[in-house]
């Protein structure tokens, strides 16, 4: 039986979040055993925030949750790809559909931002 290897990165694994319908990479976040278990159990994506040092469910503040459709691991069992149905317009906390909106062009990073919501309104604290 294959077991996910959480040992290589201090108990964390990268999780690539991909749109189930079109294959677009929406975001990359980190999971530990508990958040992977919650994701598999609940069918919603859960992550571990290295910055805030806490667990969080995608969309818990914005409402832009993700329904888990399929989960895969790589040949080393130390990374997962989670294919989701994105609820709400955007996966990125910046309001963009994907976190990957900065592109290398002509020797520099160029932002192709098209926010679908205003983060200042959504993440009031």
From Swiss-Prot:
It catalyses: 1-(5-phospho-beta-D-ribosyl)-5'-AMP + H2O = 1-(5-phospho-beta-D-ribosyl)-5-[(5-phospho-beta-D-ribosylamino)methylideneamino]imidazole-4-carboxamide. Zn(2+) binds at residues 75, 92, 99. One of its GO terms (molecular function) is magnesium ion binding. It holds the Pfam family PRA-CH. Mg(2+) binds at residues 74, 76, 78. One of its GO terms (cellular component) is cytoplasm. SUPFAM superfamilies: HisI-like (SSF141734). Its EC number is 3.5.4.19. Its main location: cytoplasm. Pathway: Amino-acid biosynthesis; L-histidine biosynthesis; L-histidine from 5-phospho-alpha-D-ribose 1-diphosphate: step 3/9. Binds 1 Mg(2+) ion per subunit. Binds 1 zinc ion per subunit. Its cofactor is Mg(2+); Zn(2+). It is an enzyme of class 3 (hydrolase). Coiled coil: none annotated. It is found in: Cytoplasm. GO terms for biological process: L-histidine biosynthetic process. InterPro entries: PRA-CH (IPR026660), PRib_AMP_CycHydrolase_dom (IPR002496), PRib_AMP_CycHydrolase_sf (IPR038019). Keywords: Amino-acid biosynthesis, Cytoplasm, Histidine biosynthesis, Hydrolase, Magnesium, Metal-binding, Zinc. Belongs to the PRA-CH family. Homodimer. Catalyzes the hydrolysis of the adenine ring of phosphoribosyl-AMP. This is Phosphoribosyl-AMP cyclohydrolase.
